[in-house]
Amino acid sequence: MKPAPFRYARAGSLAEAIALLAASPGEAKLLAGGQSLVPMLNMRLVRPAVLVDVNGLRELTGITPAPDGGLRIGALTRHADLAASPAVSERAPLLAEAARHVGHAAIRNQGTLGGSLAHADPAAELPAALVALDARVQVTGPRGAREIAAGAFFRGLLTTALEADEILTAVEVPAQAAGWGFVEIARRPGDFALAGVAAVVRVGRPLTLPSSSLGGEGEVRLVGFGVGDRPLRLRGAERVLAGGPIDAGTAARAGAAAGPDCDPPGDVHGSAEYRRHLATVLTERALLRSEERRVGKECTVLCRSRWSPYH
């Protein structure tokens, strides 16, 4: 099939793009990488009156390190650029790893961060990573600019807090902790995940081996994707870890507690029961990888600061 007729407009500025959306309320769509929109146009699942091309807007580009250790990432940043950016790998390695899991090379070269977030596919990697990182989504519209916590941005299947006349402009990512894990299961490389988990572990107290106590001085954020209608905080698993160590035993118990928070779909690729089982296994794996990274990095820093003559 081919798209239904539409008018094409290439915006020359953010203000012009907003005006074009406002001129066709509810009947305009933004074109960035087109990796989700174009197939939907071809299948006539969407029939916009106007297609507003925003690819020329410099206001939506760039990966900028922030003084606090975080990042500001423009909405037009391609997945491949996220994966290859030294700044992202250093300051938000979970996000870089998630970007490497997106589709195939052609999709990563064309698809954009903003497009993935605005489309809000519940099996997509980048939304889950940004919820785990406690990022903030910046949007601009006729009423001005506002910020939305990533956890509140995704409201359901292909549904976000973005108004029809607003444009997602950038994402603010806070400085990431040393402990993180990102795991997913797909039928083939490049396929949408049957299930996946993103984990971030922050510990505010001195390093304690062989395990780390979280309690009130640290935080663990676990987010499942492909297991509900949006990126889901696995709060049951998080509660298991409150005030205790992260080790093989607690990771396994946290994994078991993740299942009840999930409401996965069932289809020809995997039953709901199977996807829920995947969530329990992947939660355990993501936690153990997070702790391995955290302890490894903190051990390196600790050893260098105390004993290395070259530090």
What spans do the regions from the language model cover?
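C-terminal structural segment of proteins
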Residues: 1-214, 218-294
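Positively charged, low-complexity/disordered segments
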Residues: 296-311
